[in-house]
Amino acid sequence: MRKINLLDLETTNKIAAGEVIERPFSVVKELVENSIDAGAKNITIEIEDGGQNLIKIIDDGEGIYPIDIKNAFLPHATSKINSIEDIYKISTMGFRGEALASISSVSKTKLKSRVDSYNFGKEIYIEGGKIEYLKDTGCNVGTTIEVSDLFYNVPARLKFLKSARSDSSSISDIVNRFILAHPDISFNLINKGKQSIKSYGTGNLKDSIRCVYNKTISENLINFESHKDIISVYGFIGKPEISRKSRTNQSIFVNKRYVKSKFITAAVENAFKSFLTVNSYPFFVIFIDIFPEYIDVNVHPTKSEVKFKDERAMFKTIFDAVHEAIKGELKESFTNFFNKEDINMYDSEKSIAETIKLEKEEVQIPIDLNSNNKIDIFGNNINKLPNNAELLKNIGIKEKNTLENNNNFYTSKQNEICYTNKNDECLNSCNKDDYSKIEKPLQKDNKNLDALYLNEHNTNSSPINIKENKPNNFYVDMKIIGQFNNTYILIEKDKELYIIDQHAAHEKVLFEKFKSEIEKGYVISQILLSPVVIELSEDEFNIYEENKDIFKNSGFSVETFGECTINIKEVPLILGKPNVEDLFMDILYNLKNMKSKETSTIKYNAIATLACKSAVKANDNLKEEEIKKLIENMLTLNNPYTCPHGRPTMIKFTLKDLEKKFKRIQ
């Protein structure tokens, strides 16, 4: 073993500097944070050659006392904390006392500073960590620091610096983050003698967003906020039309500190998931104000990461705030189509699912998707069956129909299915009286329950609510014009033209119905007359084994049938008559290709695939009654505006929009 050497101070300082000062933008970040901590309201940043030759920061903060000028450049010298306890309640940008020491050890640094109580300031000049001089000087209140020839004495680091243009871009990016984080501070970035960025410190976040981005983005924002005991979450999220193919336009600030956090990003993106198309990322600026005791910022040399005491609660708070804001914005856009009176006819005074209770074993499935959705699709999604037959009679339960007469409105062919009877025997015909659900069984002797069950899953029946009648006023001022290309439904209502994508709309209806059934452990399966045997590769079989609970809880009954071979005996009833093998393999491939292993994300994609495969397709001709039925089912959804993949289900044109297109008005 080699001899252990004690490194000299110069070497240790350069090593430490490498952790804190990665590139010129790191210098800008550390120095601007010092200015902010000093209470500056105007901060100017000047750079040359991407900051490699010169970085100059001028602020009007409190300044540094003459007696502290030398101490400011010592390692671990700081005015932010006094003891270890202070680390757990940090309210400043900096606290370690490493920045000035690290910067001055790898550059030529000049600092001038004056406090208001002194008539003169102090100037200090340091090269490579060695003080060259310290003298009195005349200067304004505040601090001016110049950093030149960065890494001049560290050739290895200098060799790996990026181009001046790249470093300039990185500095511009970090200055823009400061502008967003501190709308009350005026920032001015000067590059090669020319003004590059300028903010005015108005205190208005929207002004800052417009300064950093552009007018289009600032005019397409949705405000959100949520305030709780120890935390406040607020900010702006962009509408779908300003989404991007990358996450560059996403900013997270925790107690005004710009950080990167995968779980916060995931919370926002999951809240936006059903409103965006695939491979698109939302614009957002999110602020999290939280008591310092509940976070730890001392987890990364550059303080770019934080840890939260309770990430689960944080995730939920952020998710709920963003999701509610987006839903509110979409509802406002389609107020005339989905007006409150029409929705209340279906949703107010509670549905029977909330009114009637049944002692039913619940299957707990860990899924966190739009949990507030009020699902009532193809018929009421009743999760609590009544014990009172008279109540069933009062709400208009029809006599039980045989399965031959149960006509699935959206399925071109009658489903070839078998139910199991009380003795679990496969029925050869579908007109007997003792049907029961294929799920965790409920043994009830009330014959009316069977009638309720069949009526509920007869997709041709109307949704069952306390108010049984359809909202007649909904159709009074609505005119169904027809279909365009057997794909888009054209509707006129209140002098507005609505175009509905029939596939996307039906897909969303099926998605919410199936998701609701899974969440409630209420999935109905159909036995296949001929089980489907699928041979899988070893990799595919392993993926199935890892996720077989997802298939089971989604209504699939799958058995292992030899090595890497499976036997599918049951599939979800909602699918109608699918191509079982193609559907199963589609879900399997989605699971394989997904980077996330989050249960909720996997379930979301699996359910979306099921819904997409089962929905009506483009070029399917629909009758007027079928169109009305689809609209009725959309009325029951809490978010009917986008399909599970984020595509819009409908778009709207006002009369004014059309007259502008035809140049009738300006």
UniProtKB/Swiss-Prot annotation:
Biological role: This protein is involved in the repair of mismatches in DNA. It is required for dam-dependent methyl-directed DNA mismatch repair. May act as a 'molecular matchmaker', a protein that promotes the formation of a stable complex between two or more DNA-binding proteins in an ATP-dependent manner without itself being part of a final effector complex.
GO BP term (any one): mismatch repair
Family: Belongs to the DNA mismatch repair MutL/HexB family.
Name of the protein described by the UniProt record: DNA mismatch repair protein MutL
Keywords: DNA damage, DNA repair
Organism: Clostridium botulinum (strain Kyoto / Type A2)
UniProt xrefs under CDD domains: HATPase_MutL-MLH-PMS-like, MutL_Trans
Molecular function per GO: ATP binding; ATP hydrolysis activity; ATP-dependent DNA damage sensor activity; mismatched DNA binding
Record-level GO cellular component terms: mismatch repair complex
Presence of the UniProt keyword Transferase in the record: no
Cited SMART domains: DNA_mis_repair, MutL_C
Domain of life: Bacteria
PROSITE patterns listed in its UniProt record: DNA_MISMATCH_REPAIR_1
Pfam families: DNA_mis_repair (PF01119), HATPase_c_3 (PF13589), MutL_C (PF08676)
